A protein has these predicted regions:
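N-terminal small-domain helix-loop-helix segment of the aminotransferase-like
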Residues: 2-94, 101
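Structured helix-beta-strand junction loops
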Residues: 53-56, 159-160, 191-192
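Hydrophobic "anchor" residues on beta-strands that sit immediately upstream
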Residues: 163, 195-196
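Walker B catalytic acidic pair
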Residues: 200
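A short helix->loop->beta-strand "cap" motif at the edges of active sites that frequently abuts
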Residues: 132, 191-194
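Aromatic/pi-system hotspot detector in well-structured domains
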Residues: 29, 177, 190
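Conserved core of the PLP fold type I
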Residues: 59-187, 204-205, 210-213
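Short glycine-centered segments of the SAM/dcSAM-binding site in methyltransferase folds
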Residues: 112, 194-195
Length: 213
């Protein structure tokens, strides 16, 4: 899809249609830009598949499509020069449940989860879902760019530190960490034996020309 696709000329009015995005500030003069939820119609191909499923009339359990798995493998290689295997992929209904599962798997009640802040709000709530504590380390601003405060990260380490909940590109500040920063981050996690859960859902939204995730 390109920016000239006619799909972008049609914007359905979702107000009054059980929309989480539009319902949050319903009745107020507010544009709801608080959530990653587009207002364009879905592509015709997606609508057609949904129609066919509805007309079939049975919504029993399914399994991941081999074609979709292959497409993800091809995409990782073509966009990110990363060769992955089919058995590395675990299909989940959403990213938030994914990092909640990771926190539960890598720690226990009373453990600590480190993260750079500010950050996507569900990061802040996830550790508490399992009796764990968030150790948020403020990012630092250098030449109009937010980056990790490695001294602050070291200071935040405790015997209870077990997991690092990482976000790259970082939401909400938009930082795409450099290779040097990522290598330094990896060394930090190895030194303190931290499991890493990395949310990279925005990896295709790179605005700098020539940038690669």
């Amino acid at each position: 899809m390109s920016h000239s696709d006619p799909l972008f000329d049609e914007v359905p009015d979702r107000r009054g249609r059980n929309s989480l995005k539009w319902g949050k500030y319903e009745g107020r003069d507010v544009l709801p830009l608080w959530v990653a939820d587009m207002d364009y119609r879905s592509p015709p191909q997606v609508i057609e598949v949904a129609k066919n499923l509805a007309e079939f009339g049975n919504f029993g359990y399914g399994k991941p499509s081999p074609a979709l798995t292959e497409l993800v493998i091809e995409r990782m290689e073509s966009l990110h020069d990363w060769q992955i295997q089919p058995n590395w992929l675990v299909w989940l209904p959403g990213m938030v449940c994914g990092f909640n599962i990771a926190i539960r798997a890598m720690g226990k009640e009373g453990d600590e989860v480190l993260s750079n802040i500010p950050v996507y709000p569900p990061f802040l709530m996830a550790p508490g879902n399992f009796g764990q504590n968030l150790a948020g380390v403020p990012m630092i601003l250098e030449e109009a760019r937010h980056t990790m405060d490695f001294d602050g990260l070291v200071s935040a380490i405790s015997p209870q530190s077990k997991t690092f909940l990482f976000c790259h590109p970082h939401n909400p500040v938009g930082t795409q960490f450099t290779r040097h920063e990522l290598e330094r981050f990896a060394e930090f996690c190895l030194r303190y034996d931290l499991g890493v859960c990395s949310d990279e859902i925005h990896c295709d939204l790179l605005l700098d020309p020539g940038a690669q995730h």
